[in-house]
């Protein structure tokens, strides 16, 4: 088998299909663009959906990619199985109505077996087909050199996810050999396609040839599609494990550098790929999660309490907890980010380029979580005290969930602390609470953000609704023309009434509420009855498939279809959003003025508190250019330029010099917003009346979110002033701490401190080395003998595992004994190291085996190589017993 790196395997896949006329599409951002139904890009085909559903016709119907993706539905299995990941890459080739099985199957075989490409042994390849897909079976038999008996018919080989395209598929398996076999030969699962470790699925070819129409349940009744498609997926991590003979996906060049770096950070435990253990699980979880965290933050997602941000936060917290299990103290994940960048640099250079920004975000979140752990422990202690006071033996699931959901305190830690206090946790009730939250989250994601796709009631809604928010923020005597909510069966339906405390969707014949669009968040506000009483709060506004503004409202007082109501927009929010939207247009223009006319918008978000603007640019924007952009913005703000708008036809708008947002689609009539003579753009949002209303503009950050795409986050008005004040305060505090007379003296003080620190560090290292040499001279004379084997045991006062290693290195210079066992204690934690001489190894004494037999005495575990192993524990009193166990171990050798 060829010796290929992960980078070579990926590139070879893309090169092969490029040679077959495919367009190589770069891996897209993990954050879906214009697809609110997805939290993350979760498959190789997800970014190509617009081609498969016919929304967009590709320039080339043949496409290939290697797409990064995130899935977290099985997060609990990560590290416990061989192939579960949160971040993974899916390589694929796709045909949009072009070639079909006759070419897809032979090409797959050529890539896998040709010496020019992967060169896998044909005898080790097996395929499965759908029993009714004899066409595919015949192609495998006649158009490839697949050995006889290597085709299995499997009923599950039919890809069908509901209404729409569907079809049979062929899965390709690689026989890893008897050393990977985990089931008896006669086990019903011991075949390609069964649940076993020997036959590994490496590629799935989906033949999308049928149309699953509504009401049909038997796939034999599905009509054929007029244009058939090919959709294949090869998991990079899986196929790399084949070429690199990894026992799991983690035992490859995609993960091992991260694991090795984590071993060094642990200083107590080592990863042993020959077995499954809790220690190995922790190494794997950390390696998996830091990859996902690094890529997600690099693509623009940030830790938060909801949506994508919550996924990042959860992954990071799980990784931190597993780091603690490995004895890692303090912040450590930030040290692993550059390693991810190095591993993936060949295909994702932007990750390495954004390392500093990603590290900063990770470090801040780690610090926040460490504070959470401290605060959570205090709250948990109160819960434990109350439970004991009332004679309970269990912490309620509701309390455990509250600690987790509200305060971010993980269930695992709650269980650990409860056990120490002699209590248990009601995990079943906790899971009930968690499931209820997931149901709420799914409902929230599906109600309005994806209404154009999911809600048939809205699709059929034909009532008229006029938006007047460009010129007014209040409307009197608006009529309620539609109420949408759950009927008695829990199904969305048109209702006649809205009851108190319900959350429903409402359409009015005329509305001042802006619907979320073009990156601008929606207006909030109130619905009032004719007496002026608030009867509902508007909490969201979206555009329905037929253009109506659909208002999500929390009902305070019941109302009825046809009622006349007054509508009032929350002015504070509206004004803040409008100012930031105007700033977004000005920033767009300033970027083009400073960086060049080739710069175009790649996305935006306009919130009340801040604005975010994405744009194309190769490489980071220099600090000098950022200063120019910021200065230009504030100069134009100071000019008090008027902000005006007009509606006209698209050709007239272009003649006026209005700029269209790249990638947006426009109708015949467009709205043009002008900011004096500074900027003209097509736009449908709300704006300030003049630039002076913005007050001040401040760039908060500039970063990369993908290949060739940069992001600026900025604030205006009082938010900008607060930024300046916060920076000034921080500088003053730094100057005070440094005892600098003036702020301008602070940098020189920092340089002096750095020089002093380097001097102290060198001195400390010198003292450590001298201490190790002195200690070694004392203990190497105390040699004991048992069963003809010599050994030394000693408890030392050195600086943790590094100090023990220093002494062990001195011991290796002349091997005064067959075995060396050293221990030290710091903060009630034991570090233990075992070294075995080459002669001892030859006589069957392995350091890794010895440490596993003695580590339980110190309340811990460990492992390592035959010549060197280490362990950690929480029981210093057990050190004498551990040393005594050395003699017993050697007596049996």
From Swiss-Prot:
GO cellular component: cytosol
Reactions listed under catalytic activity: tRNA(Ala) + L-alanine + ATP = L-alanyl-tRNA(Ala) + AMP + diphosphate
Main location: cytoplasm
Keyword terms: Aminoacyl-tRNA synthetase, ATP-binding, Cytoplasm, Ligase, Nucleotide-binding, Protein biosynthesis, RNA-binding, tRNA-binding
Compartment(s) of residence: Cytoplasm
GO biological process, any: alanyl-tRNA aminoacylation
InterPro entries: aa-tRNA-synth_II/BPL/LPL, Ala-tRNA-lgiase_IIc, Ala-tRNA-ligase_IIc_anticod-bd, Ala-tRNA-synth_IIc_core, Ala-tRNA-synth_IIc_N, Ala-tRNA_ligase, Ala_tRNA_ligase_euk/bac, DHHA1_dom
One Gene Ontology MF term: aminoacyl-tRNA deacylase activity
Cited Pfam families: DHHA1 (PF02272), tRNA-synt_2c (PF01411), tRNA_SAD (PF07973)
EC number: 6.1.1.7
PANTHER family reported for this sequence: ALANINE--TRNA LIGASE, CYTOPLASMIC (PTHR11777:SF9), ALANYL-TRNA SYNTHETASE (PTHR11777)
Function: Catalyzes the attachment of alanine to tRNA(Ala) in a two-step reaction: alanine is first activated by ATP to form Ala-AMP and then transferred to the acceptor end of tRNA(Ala). Also edits incorrectly charged Ser-tRNA(Ala) and Gly-tRNA(Ala) via its editing domain.
Entry similarity comment: Belongs to the class-II aminoacyl-tRNA synthetase family.
Protein name per Swiss-Prot or TrEMBL: Alanine--tRNA ligase
Organism: Leuconostoc mesenteroides subsp. mesenteroides (strain ATCC 8293 / DSM 20343 / BCRC 11652 / CCM 1803 / JCM 6124 / NCDO 523 / NBRC 100496 / NCIMB 8023 / NCTC 12954 / NRRL B-1118 / 37Y)
Encoding gene, per UniProt annotation: alaS
């Amino acid at each position: 088998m060829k010796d290929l790196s992960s980078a070579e395997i990926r590139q070879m896949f893309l090169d092969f299909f490029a040679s077959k006329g495919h367009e190589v599409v770069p891996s897209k951002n993990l954050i879906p663009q214009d697809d609110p139904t997805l939290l993350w890009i979760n498959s190789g085909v997800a970014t190509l959906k617009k081609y498969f559903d016919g929304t967009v016709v590709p320039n080339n119907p043949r496409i290939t990619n290697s797409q990064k993706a995130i899935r977290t539905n099985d997060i609990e299995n990560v590290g416990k199985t061989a192939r579960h990941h949160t971040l993974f890459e899916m390589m694929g080739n796709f045909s949009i109505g072009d070639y079909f099985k006759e070419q897809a199957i032979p090409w797959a075989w050529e890539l896998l077996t040709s010496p020019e490409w992967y060169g896998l042994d044909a005898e080790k390849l097996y395929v499965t087909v759908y029993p009714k897909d004899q066409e595919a079976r015949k192609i495998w038999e006649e158009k490839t050199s697949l050995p006889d008996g290597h085709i299995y018919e499997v009923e599950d080989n039919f890809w069908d996810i509901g209404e729409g395209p569907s079809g049979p598929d062929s899965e390709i398996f690689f026989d890893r050999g008897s050393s990977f076999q985990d089931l008896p030969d006669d086990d019903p699962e011991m075949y390609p396609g069964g649940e076993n470790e020997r036959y590994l699925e490496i590629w799935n070819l989906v033949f999308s040839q049928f149309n699953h129409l509504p009401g049909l349940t038997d796939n034999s009744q599905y009509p054929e599609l007029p244009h058939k498609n090919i959709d294949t997926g090869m998991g990079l991590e899986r196929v790399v494990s084949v070429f690199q003979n990894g026992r799991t996906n983690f035992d490859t060049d995609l993960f091992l550098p991260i694991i090795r770096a984590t071993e060094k950070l642990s200083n107590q435990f080592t990863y042993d790929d020959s077995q499954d253990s809790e220690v190995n699980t922790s190494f794997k979880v950390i390696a998996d999660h830091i990859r996902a965290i690094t890529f997600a933050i690099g693509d623009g997602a940030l830790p938060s309490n909801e949506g994508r941000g919550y996924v990042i936060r959860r992954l990071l917290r799980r990784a931190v907890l597993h780091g603690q299990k490995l004895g890692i103290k303090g912040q450590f994940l930030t040290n692993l980010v550059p390693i991810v960048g190095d591993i993936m640099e060949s295909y994702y250079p932007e990750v390495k380029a954004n390392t500093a920004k990603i590290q900063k975000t990770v470090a801040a979140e780690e610090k926040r979580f460490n504070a959470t752990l401290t605060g959570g422990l205090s709250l948990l202690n109160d819960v434990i005290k109350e439970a004991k006071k009332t004679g309970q033996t269990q912490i309620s699931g509701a309390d455990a969930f509250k600690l987790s959901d509200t305060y971010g305190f993980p269930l695992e830690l709650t269980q650990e602390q409860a056990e120490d206090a002699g209590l248990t946790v009601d995990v079943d009730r906790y899971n009930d609470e968690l499931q209820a939250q997931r149901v709420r989250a799914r409902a929230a994601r599906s109600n309005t953000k994806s209404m154009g796709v999911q809600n048939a009631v809205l699709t059929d809604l034909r009532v008229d609704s006029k938006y007047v928010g460009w010129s007014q923020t209040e409307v009197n005597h608006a009529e309620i023309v539609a109420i949408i909510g759950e009927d008695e069966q829990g199904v969305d339906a048109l209702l006649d009434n809205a009851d108190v405390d319900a959350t429903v969707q409402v359409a009015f014949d005329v509305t001042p509420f802006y619907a979320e669009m073009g990156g601008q968040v929606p207006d909030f506000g109130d619905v009032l009855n004719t007496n002026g009483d608030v009867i509902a709060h508007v909490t969201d506004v979206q555009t329905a498939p037929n253009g109506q503004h659909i208002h999500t409202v929390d009902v305070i007082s019941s109302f009825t279809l046809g009622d006349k109501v007054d509508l009032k927009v929350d002015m504070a929010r509206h004004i803040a959003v409008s100012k930031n939207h105007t700033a977004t247009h000005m920033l767009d223009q300033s970027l083009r003025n400073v960086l060049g006319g080739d710069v175009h918008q790649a996305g935006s978000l306009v919130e009340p508190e801040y604005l975010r603007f994405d744009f194309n640019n190769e490489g980071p924007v220099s600090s000098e250019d950022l200063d120019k952009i910021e200065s230009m913005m504030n100069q134009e703000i100071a000019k008090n330029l008027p902000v005006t708008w007009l509606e006209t036809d698209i050709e007239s708008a272009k003649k006026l010099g209005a700029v269209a947002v790249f990638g947006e689609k426009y109708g015949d009539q467009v709205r043009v917003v002008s900011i004096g003579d500074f900027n003209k753009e097509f736009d449908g949002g709300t704006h300030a009346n003049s630039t002076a209303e913005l007050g001040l503009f401040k760039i908060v950050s500039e970063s990369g979110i993908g290949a060739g795409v940069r992001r600026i986050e900025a604030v205006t008005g009082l938010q900008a002033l607060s930024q300046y004040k916060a920076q000034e305060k921080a500088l003053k505090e730094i100057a005070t701490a440094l005892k600098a007379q003036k702020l301008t003296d602070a940098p020189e003080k920092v340089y002096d401190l750095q020089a002093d620190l380097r001097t102290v560090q060198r001195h400390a290292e010198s003292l450590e080395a001298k201490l190790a040499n002195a200690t070694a001279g004392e203990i190497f004379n105390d040699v004991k003998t048992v069963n003809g084997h010599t050994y030394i045991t000693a408890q030392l006062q050195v600086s943790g595992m590094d100090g023990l290693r220093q002494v062990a290195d001195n011991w290796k210079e002349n091997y005064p004994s067959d075995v060396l066992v050293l221990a030290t204690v710091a903060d009630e934690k034991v570090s233990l190291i075992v070294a075995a001489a080459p002669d001892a190894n030859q006589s069957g004494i392995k350091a890794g085996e010895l440490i596993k037999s003695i580590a339980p005495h110190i309340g811990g575990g460990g492992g390592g190589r035959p010549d060197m192993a280490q362990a950690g524990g929480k029981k210093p009193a057990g050190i004498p017993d551990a040393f005594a166990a050395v003699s017993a171990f050697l007596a049996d050798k």
